[in-house]
Amino acid sequence: MTDVALPPAALTLPNDSVGVVTPQRMHFQEPLKLRNGSSIAGYDLMVETYGTLNADRSNAVLVCHALNASHHVAGVYADDPRDVGWWDNMVGPGKPLDTNRFFVIGVNNLGSCFGSTGPMSTNPATGEPYGAAFPVVTVEDWVNAQARVADVFGITQFAAVMGGSLGGMQAVAWSLMYPQRLRHCIVVASTPKLSAQNIAFNEVARSSILSDPDFHGGNYYAHGVKPKRGLRVARMIGHITYLSDEDMAEKFGRELKTEDIRFSFDVEFQVESYLRYQGDKFAEYFDANTYLLITRALDYFDPALAYGGDLTRAMAQTQASFLVASFTTDWRFAPNRSRELVKALLDNKRPVSYAEIDAPHGHDAFLLDDPRYHNLMRAYYDRIAEEIGA
């Protein structure tokens, strides 16, 4: 279990923070069979927990992360109090996912670059980093690995599995692969599968990495370099899809970086400066091989594929109650994609609540502190708490 410590004397945190947290490294020796037919053994998963697991282990909530996030869902680290968890506004004492009532688990997925076994890890067969030799992983593989984490805690059924974007896909996969192991499935700003346009954006991003001279076929670690140029462009492309046109107009408009145009190809507009800043920052902390793996996992997710593309038939296996939420200006995973999932659930007479939230911030709205959005989540978790007596 993650240690939750008192903050250092010099560090003052809000009363609704989970405080200073320490992640736990879980080691699993038993091979994990992957969807591609291979397996991986002797792997690690980074885990953080918040709150207290009750006696009957009924108050656990699994939070699944999106592309560039990790197990660090909430709180801060003692050695870097600026590193606040990526969903800190959602998880904590008195917050929508209230850690006074729920035991919350964050798991860093296989293939990531934040401590779980991935391309940067040492391949026991060679003694060198896996690099391009790391197996392609899928959403289903992540869910199977997360189930093993639940087993370690003795959790037979989650009160809820929750996620936004790619995290929402993992929540859907949980409802299909382990239907008896979750009471509620909370899917935010997500989709039952990527559209051709979504896949196209991922392909352009991957191509920018693959064509970077410093990529070296994915084995750039041995060369002491990193394909930062490709990562920068990939992040810039992705970031455009996370924001709405309205939000970009409000933040940047056509504002120039300097007073007058300079008739050059240097940064002229504020929006250019912003994208370059985001790209530079991302290239410093993220791994290119991980980016390739996770975007490909996004592409492959399609639970209806085994049912001839019939999502209604696919969702017939679910037993959980659902909350599905979308945002009006999200064009990466537009509201109609969430409605596809809702329709499939209703066709199967499954209990589902749906909210389409009018918010100007595009796809990234699921990470923001919108009162209507948070009130929705708070009310739904109040309902879950009442069900389980938390």
Swiss-Prot record:
Q: Which family does it belong to?
A: Belongs to the AB hydrolase superfamily. MetX family.
Catalytic activities:
L-homoserine + succinyl-CoA = O-succinyl-L-homoserine + CoA
User: Which Gene Ontology terms describe the biological processes this protein takes part in?
Assistant: homoserine metabolic process; methionine biosynthetic process
Q: Name one GO molecular function term.
A: homoserine O-acetyltransferase activity
Which EC class does it fall in? transferase
Q: Which residues bind substrate?
A: R235, D364
Q: Which Gene3D superfamilies match?
A: 1.10.1740.110, alpha/beta hydrolase (3.40.50.1820)
- Alphabetical UniProt keywords: Acyltransferase, Amino-acid biosynthesis, Cytoplasm, Methionine biosynthesis, Transferase
PANTHER family per record = HOMOSERINE O-ACETYLTRANSFERASE
Name recorded for this polypeptide: Homoserine O-succinyltransferase
Query: Does the record carry Metal-binding as a key word?
Result: no
Q: Which GO terms describe its cellular component?
A: cytoplasm
Q: In which pathway does it act?
A: Amino-acid biosynthesis; L-methionine biosynthesis via de novo pathway; O-succinyl-L-homoserine from L-homoserine: step 1/1
Q: Give every AB hydrolase-1 domain span.
A: 59-369
Chain segments annotated as transmembrane: none
Site Important for acyl-CoA specificity: list residues: R332
Q: Which InterPro entries match?
A: AB_hydrolase_1, AB_hydrolase_fold, HAT_MetX-like
Query: Which proteins does it associate with, and in what oligomeric form?
Result: Homodimer.
Q: Which organism is it from?
A: Cupriavidus pinatubonensis (strain JMP 134 / LMG 1197)
The catalytic activity of this protein is classed by the Enzyme Commission as 2.3.1.46
